[in-house]
């Protein structure tokens, strides 16, 4: 019997509790039976994909060999290869589709989608959503029967041996001990099962727990970070004592979104908007217009002013937590962890291919992910080589080091302040000498050129000296703050638990979900209706094209505002816009009259002000 890995006890102590959503069909599993059920393929540039290892012949030991490798080659597994179906199952495409439809119907009977996905966003997002759906017909995607086929294969594996596993890794970086829980799901059926953005074979998700050494030498949890789509940095991270971090004993609770398997801290429905970036020049124009509208005119103050692209595709992550619970106190217990030791095993470090079907999707949403160590482009993933930086923790010292780090930074500033004082003294003396020279040559015609040059040097040196003195004053203030901060830390005081979060991903509130059936129906038909009306106007009302378009746009704007409860905002914004347009029209029509009137008003004001001064 093999001795347990030394990191296993640490991983088990803080292993997460997963609360999944009712209707989800795929759960975290050991990769070994998955790989055994897959076939291995290679896609070379300009060629058709070639199967190099059939299903049932692949193992974790042979996976890293990557036969037929070459420049531009993409190796990928295929879990839903029809030739991999268990004996006794029909292998026809029609039969697979029939089983897929049956499985999807069973999922929909259990899972009921939330209300108002499209009703939560505006016309532009709905239009982009329609275009995104249309592109699925042209771009690479996972076949429609893949989810059903994957469910059948997965059920067969679970019947052989039911198990719920994670692959654990313990990384040590800059004073932090990082427990990485890699969760492998055999399939992501977000699009086909839960109205999401994509489907793809295989899904690697992760939960990180960050430990630091306490004064008594024991490792204690300080932070957690849950992977959620492509987010990274401070907004992913929560402090261990944050009320949002639900725990069962020492086990953090993770709410897993149906199909996508994104991880959240609280149950609910999360609106996820995929941004479509604009070209750089258009993005600059858009930011300028938005800044003028929000900051200069003060419109939509208090709303979501984040720096995002103007075009979003809305999707909903259903992380309800009403399904299977895996972990401490749950419906199913975790199997012993599959520890990823150091150096990493060959199946982790040697296989750089994809863990499922390579659909050749230009957006990559339908392509399977790479393993825990790599990105899809075969580069090493940041979460692997820099787990603290991935969650924005690289700038945060451990609690035991925080006060010392603040005092050390204060000493650095003190050294720089001494250097600044010396430099300021030297340049101040030089400035006084140049000032004396400038005064000496003033009024001497034969020294005019030298005088201009001296005055220029005086101005430049004075400005530089001002900047140095401003930096010294700022450093003095920062040094005082560092001393005060170190004192608070030494006294045991902590920063607010959520001070690092700039944009928390929160579930939709009850108010946001309170859409009527009429509002939902309007959201579903509005874009199509708008396009039909615009086409009809272009065909039948060419003589009144502009006026009819204005009337149509106004109708759709007011209808949308009414359904979304923003009619008052729209009326206010419309008034401001109409006032601006009216001002421009008046300026254009009566430009010279307005100029004359403005000159007369200014002259009368100056005369009145001067007469008032004489009377004092």
Regions found by a protein language model. Give the residues of each.
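Conserved hydrophobic/aromatic beta-strand scaffold that supports enzyme active sites
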Residues: 206-208
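Alpha-helical transmembrane segments of integral membrane proteins
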Residues: 496, 503-616
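A domain-level signal for the mature, folded cores of soluble proteins
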Residues: 1-203, 215-514, 521-528
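Short beta-strand micro-motifs enriched in acidic
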Residues: 210-214
């Amino acid at each position: 019997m093999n001795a347990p890995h030394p990191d296993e006890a640490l991983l088990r102590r803080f292993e997460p509790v997963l609360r999944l959503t009712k209707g989800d069909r795929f759960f975290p599993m050991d990769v070994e039976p998955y790989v055994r059920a897959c076939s291995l393929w290679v896609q070379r540039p300009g060629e058709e994909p070639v199967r190099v290892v059939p299903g049932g012949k692949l193992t974790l030991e042979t996976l890293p060999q990557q036969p037929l490798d070459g420049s531009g080659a993409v190796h990928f597994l295929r879990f839903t290869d029809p030739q991999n179906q268990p004996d006794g199952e029909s292998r026809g495409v029609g039969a697979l589709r029939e089983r897929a439809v049956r499985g999807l119907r069973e999922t929909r009977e259990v899972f009921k989608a939330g209300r108002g996905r499209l009703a939560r966003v505006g016309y532009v997002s709905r239009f982009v959503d329609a275009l995104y759906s249309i592109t699925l017909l042209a771009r690479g995607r996972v076949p429609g029967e893949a989810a059903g086929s994957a469910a059948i294969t997965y059920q067969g594996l679970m019947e052989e041996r039911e198990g719920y596993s994670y692959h654990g890794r313990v990384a040590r970086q800059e004073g932090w001990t990082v427990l990485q829980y890699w969760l492998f799901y055999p399939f992501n059926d977000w699009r086909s099962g839960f109205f999401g953005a994509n489907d793809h074979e295989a899904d690697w998700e992760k939960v990180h727990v960050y430990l630091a050494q306490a004064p008594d030498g024991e490792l204690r949890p300080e932070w957690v970070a849950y992977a959620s789509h492509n987010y990274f940095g401070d907004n992913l991270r929560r402090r261990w004592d944050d009320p949002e971090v639900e725990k069962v004993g020492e086990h953090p609770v993770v709410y897993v979104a149906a199909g996508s398997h994104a991880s959240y801290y609280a149950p609910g429905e999360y609106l996820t908007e995929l941004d479509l970036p604009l070209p750089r020049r258009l993005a600059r124009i858009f930011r300028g217009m938005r800044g003028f509208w929000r900051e200069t005119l003060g419109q939509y103050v208090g709303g979501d002013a984040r720096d995002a692209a103007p075009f979003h595709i809305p999707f909903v992550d259903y992380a309800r937590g009403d399904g299977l619970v895996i972990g401490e106190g749950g419906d199913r217990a975790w199997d012993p962890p599959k520890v990823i030791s150091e150096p990493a095993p060959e199946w982790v470090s040697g296989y750089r291919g994809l863990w499922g079907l390579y659909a050749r999707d230009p957006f990559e949403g339908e392509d399977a992910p790479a393993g825990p160590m790599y990105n899809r482009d075969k580069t090493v993933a940041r979460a692997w080589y820099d787990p603290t930086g991935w969650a924005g923790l690289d700038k945060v010292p451990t609690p035991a080091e925080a006060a010392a780090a603040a005092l050390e930074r204060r000493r650095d500033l003190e050294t720089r302040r001494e250097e600044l004082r010396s430099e300021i003294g030297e340049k101040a003396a030089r400035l006084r000498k140049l000032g004396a020279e400038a005064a000496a040559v003033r009024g001497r015609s034969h020294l005019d050129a030298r005088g201009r040059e001296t005055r220029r040097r005086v101005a430049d040196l004075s400005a530089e000296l001002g900047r140095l003195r401003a930096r010294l004053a700022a450093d003095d203030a920062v040094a005082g703050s560092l001393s005060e901060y170190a004192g608070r830390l030494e006294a045991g005081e902590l920063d607010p638990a959520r001070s690092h979060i700039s944009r928390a991903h929160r579930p939709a509130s009850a108010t946001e979900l309170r859409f009527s059936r009429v509002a939902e129906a309007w959201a579903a038909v509005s874009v199509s209706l708008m396009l039909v009306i615009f086409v009809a106007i272009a065909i039948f009302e060419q003589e009144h094209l502009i006026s009819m378009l204005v009337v149509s746009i106004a109708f759709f704007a007011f209808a949308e505002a009414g359904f979304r409860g923003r009619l008052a905002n729209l009326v206010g914004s419309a008034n401001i816009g109409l006032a601006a347009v009216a001002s421009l029209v008046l300026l254009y029509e009566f430009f010279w009259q307005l100029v004359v009137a403005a000159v007369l008003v200014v002259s009368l004001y100056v005369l009145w002000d001067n007469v008032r001064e004489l009377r004092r």
